[in-house]
Protein backbone atom coordinates (compact mmCIF):
# COMPACT_ATOMS: atom_id res chain seq x y z
CA UNK A 1 0.00 0.00 0.00
CA UNK A 2 1.40 3.42 -0.95
CA UNK A 3 1.25 6.59 1.10
CA UNK A 4 -1.31 8.00 -1.37
CA UNK A 5 -3.55 4.97 -0.85
CA UNK A 6 -3.25 5.29 2.94
CA UNK A 7 -4.14 8.99 2.81
CA UNK A 8 -7.07 8.28 0.49
CA UNK A 9 -8.35 5.60 2.87
CA UNK A 10 -8.08 7.99 5.83
CA UNK A 11 -9.80 10.72 3.85
CA UNK A 12 -12.81 8.47 3.23
CA UNK A 13 -13.18 7.40 6.89
CA UNK A 14 -16.00 8.58 9.15
CA UNK A 15 -15.27 10.56 12.31
CA UNK A 16 -15.91 7.57 14.57
CA UNK A 17 -13.57 5.43 12.49
CA UNK A 18 -10.89 8.13 12.65
CA UNK A 19 -11.28 8.30 16.43
CA UNK A 20 -10.84 4.52 16.68
CA UNK A 21 -7.79 4.73 14.41
CA UNK A 22 -6.18 7.36 16.62
CA UNK A 23 -6.85 5.33 19.78
CA UNK A 24 -5.46 2.18 18.18
CA UNK A 25 -2.30 4.04 17.05
CA UNK A 26 -1.84 5.48 20.55
CA UNK A 27 -2.07 2.01 22.11
CA UNK A 28 0.07 0.27 19.48
CA UNK A 29 2.92 2.79 19.52
CA UNK A 30 2.62 4.07 23.11
CA UNK A 31 2.19 7.70 22.09
CA UNK A 32 -0.35 10.45 22.67
CA UNK A 33 -2.17 12.30 19.91
CA UNK A 34 -2.62 15.43 22.02
CA UNK A 35 -1.30 18.59 20.42
CA UNK A 36 2.01 19.91 21.69
CA UNK A 37 1.86 23.38 23.22
CA UNK A 38 4.39 25.74 21.71
CA UNK A 39 5.18 28.95 23.57
CA UNK A 40 6.93 31.66 21.60
CA UNK A 41 9.22 34.37 22.94
CA UNK A 42 7.95 37.94 22.91
CA UNK A 43 10.31 40.71 21.82
CA UNK A 44 13.45 38.82 22.74
CA UNK A 45 12.20 37.84 26.21
CA UNK A 46 10.54 34.74 27.57
CA UNK A 47 6.77 34.73 27.79
CA UNK A 48 5.63 34.41 31.39
CA UNK A 49 2.20 32.88 31.80
CA UNK A 50 0.09 34.70 34.36
CA UNK A 51 -0.97 32.50 37.25
CA UNK A 52 -4.75 32.07 37.42
CA UNK A 53 -5.15 29.80 40.44
CA UNK A 54 -3.74 30.54 43.86
CA UNK A 55 -3.32 28.73 47.16
CA UNK A 56 -3.74 30.68 50.40
CA UNK A 57 -1.12 29.48 52.88
CA UNK A 58 -1.39 30.35 56.58
CA UNK A 59 2.23 30.80 57.69
CA UNK A 60 1.48 31.46 61.36
CA UNK A 61 -1.30 32.78 63.56
CA UNK A 62 0.73 35.51 65.21
CA UNK A 63 -0.32 36.78 68.62
CA UNK A 64 -4.10 36.78 67.91
CA UNK A 65 -4.62 33.05 67.57
CA UNK A 66 -8.29 33.18 68.62
CA UNK A 67 -9.12 35.82 65.99
CA UNK A 68 -7.28 33.79 63.34
CA UNK A 69 -9.22 30.64 64.29
CA UNK A 70 -12.47 32.61 63.95
CA UNK A 71 -11.39 33.89 60.53
CA UNK A 72 -10.40 30.38 59.38
CA UNK A 73 -13.80 29.06 60.50
CA UNK A 74 -15.58 31.81 58.60
CA UNK A 75 -13.52 31.28 55.43
CA UNK A 76 -13.56 27.48 55.34
CA UNK A 77 -16.81 26.60 57.10
CA UNK A 78 -14.92 24.25 59.43
CA UNK A 79 -15.94 23.60 63.01
CA UNK A 80 -14.05 25.10 65.95
CA UNK A 81 -11.89 22.02 66.57
CA UNK A 82 -11.00 21.59 62.88
CA UNK A 83 -10.20 25.29 62.44
CA UNK A 84 -7.99 25.24 65.54
CA UNK A 85 -6.21 22.19 64.12
CA UNK A 86 -5.54 24.01 60.84
CA UNK A 87 -4.14 27.04 62.68
CA UNK A 88 -2.00 24.84 64.95
CA UNK A 89 -0.55 23.00 61.92
CA UNK A 90 0.65 26.21 60.21
CA UNK A 91 2.14 26.58 57.67
CA UNK A 92 -0.97 25.06 56.11
CA UNK A 93 -3.09 25.68 53.01
CA UNK A 94 -6.39 27.32 53.90
CA UNK A 95 -7.85 27.38 50.36
CA UNK A 96 -6.40 25.92 47.17
CA UNK A 97 -6.84 26.62 43.45
CA UNK A 98 -8.96 29.76 43.84
CA UNK A 99 -9.07 32.96 41.82
CA UNK A 100 -6.65 35.81 42.49
CA UNK A 101 -9.46 38.07 43.75
CA UNK A 102 -10.74 35.47 46.22
CA UNK A 103 -7.21 34.66 47.38
CA UNK A 104 -6.41 38.32 48.02
CA UNK A 105 -9.69 38.81 49.91
CA UNK A 106 -8.98 35.79 52.13
CA UNK A 107 -5.40 36.95 52.68
CA UNK A 108 -6.63 40.40 53.75
CA UNK A 109 -9.17 38.88 56.16
CA UNK A 110 -6.56 36.60 57.76
CA UNK A 111 -3.98 39.39 58.01
CA UNK A 112 -6.61 41.63 59.60
CA UNK A 113 -7.09 38.90 62.22
CA UNK A 114 -3.33 38.96 62.89
CA UNK A 115 -2.09 36.04 60.79
CA UNK A 116 0.89 35.86 58.46
CA UNK A 117 -0.26 34.65 55.02
CA UNK A 118 1.32 33.96 51.61
CA UNK A 119 -0.23 33.30 48.21
CA UNK A 120 1.26 30.64 45.95
UniProtKB/Swiss-Prot annotation:
One of its GO terms (biological process) is translation. One of its GO terms (molecular function) is structural constituent of ribosome. Disulfide bonds: none annotated. It holds the Pfam family Ribosomal_L12_N. It comes from the Bacteria. The keyword Ribonucleoprotein applies. Signal peptide: none annotated. Gene3D superfamilies: 3.30.1390.10, Single helix bin. Keywords: Ribonucleoprotein, Ribosomal protein. The keyword Lipid metabolism does not apply. One of its GO terms (cellular component) is cytosolic large ribosomal subunit. Homodimer. Part of the ribosomal stalk of the 50S ribosomal subunit. Forms a multimeric L10(L12)X complex, where L10 forms an elongated spine to which 2 to 4 L12 dimers bind in a sequential fashion. Binds GTP-bound translation factors. Forms part of the ribosomal stalk which helps the ribosome interact with GTP-bound translation factors. Is thus essential for accurate translation. Belongs to the bacterial ribosomal protein bL12 family. NCBIfam families: L12. This is Large ribosomal subunit protein bL12. It comes from Alkaliphilus metalliredigens (strain QYMF). The gene is rplL.
Amino acid sequence: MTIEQILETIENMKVLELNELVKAAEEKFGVSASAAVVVGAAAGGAVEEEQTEFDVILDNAGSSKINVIKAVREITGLGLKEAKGVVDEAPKAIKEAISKEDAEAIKAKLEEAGASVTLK
